[in-house]
Curated annotation (Swiss-Prot):
It is found in: Cytoplasm. Homodimer. This is Adenylosuccinate synthetase. One of its GO terms (molecular function) is GTP binding. It comes from Clostridium botulinum (strain Eklund 17B / Type B). It catalyses: IMP + L-aspartate + GTP = N(6)-(1,2-dicarboxyethyl)-AMP + GDP + phosphate + 2 H(+). SUPFAM superfamilies: P-loop containing nucleoside triphosphate hydrolases. Binds 1 Mg(2+) ion per subunit. Keywords: Cytoplasm, GTP-binding, Ligase, Magnesium, Metal-binding, Nucleotide-binding, Purine biosynthesis. Its EC number is 6.3.4.4. Pfam families: Adenylsucc_synt (PF00709).
Amino acid sequence: MSAFIVLGAQWGDEGKGKMTDYLAEEAEVVVRFQGGNNAGHTVEVGDKQYKLHLIPSGILYDDKLNVIGNGVVVDPKALFEEINYLEGVGVNVTPEKLIISDRAQLIMPYHKTLDVLKEKARGKNDIGTTGKGIGPCYTDKFERCGIRVCDLMHEDVFKEKLEENIRMKNEYITKVLGGEPLSFSEILNEYLEFAKKLRPFVQDTSVKVYNNIKENKTVLFEGAQGMLLDIDYGTYPYVTSSNTTAGGVCSGIGIGPNMVTNAVGITKAYTTRVGKGPFPTELVDETGDWIREKGHEYGVTTGRSRRCGWLDLVIVKTAARVSGLTSLAVTKIDTLAGLEKLKVCVGYKFDGKVIDYFPASLEDLAKCEPVYEEFDGWDDSVAEARTYEELPENAKKYLNRIAEFTDTKISIIGVGPKREQTIRIDSI
């Protein structure tokens, strides 16, 4: 195993931060390949809790190289706020530990302004954006007017591109969206200061990662969000603006698919999602509220409460197929401890038949009725288990059904938020 991917197999918030931190112990390089600071990871080590948004989880180790690839959109202000936060809690962030792609797109102040104003203009049809400027930044990338990190390293180039973008964006912001114009000089001065601080971290990350893999070093690719938020395979338009599946790794860092050996899908023992969008197994009742409170289901980035529901294996099976998952890591089975009965969705009733795939059309999905299997629950002793054999029998039956239905082995089980509350039962 020289290069492997850690991906969310649901709508994000599956526990990727903890699992990446756990698996990073085996890696020498940890790489982010898509998304931006709209993602949030919580990692607990001992009695300390760390909240990460943009920087890879491997930063908590002193001996790991962390990489922000070209597929990531970088907000310099958010980046240095996160660096300051980490250094304030005793985590060193240096160019020896963190490098950033010169090809990564920069999130600019007008991206955040556009994000907020366009969401407001949608009214009741809003898509639940975090307002971080992620979507507008990716839009500029594909409209070929985006500003990259390498542009910021050349003052004249940056100034010219910024001037043209400010002219165009201000016209749209003021005349179409009714907002206030942004100041060219303020943004220029702010970003030139960022350039000085950013320069030591910048290099061609594709070459760096490629060389590390060729030297047989272990590289971990850390996904953000989840498969059902993928721009192509998610619940469009209630998705993020990047490819969150395994396919995003190759374009998001610049390596070939033959260099990736394994892909681990992270899934909770139940299902959650934030914001609007379809959710077939959602529990809008006391059980859903109970899961939310016991599982502390509130967003790291936004603080928004997460919608909670029964485990939807149709979603996880779809993730396994689309990303070619070689194993699953099932998290938060301790959260379900105490429920007498549990349900798992193994299909949808649709147009008089049962299907086991996720429809592309939201209109079709709205007609789908979950088909459930019921399981007996388990008690809180599950949180004390450190081997598979120590798990309650009912928890084992639940996990076995997950592996059977998705045709994907389970390699890791999470029984609590801390690094040590992790059971390894197989290779990934």
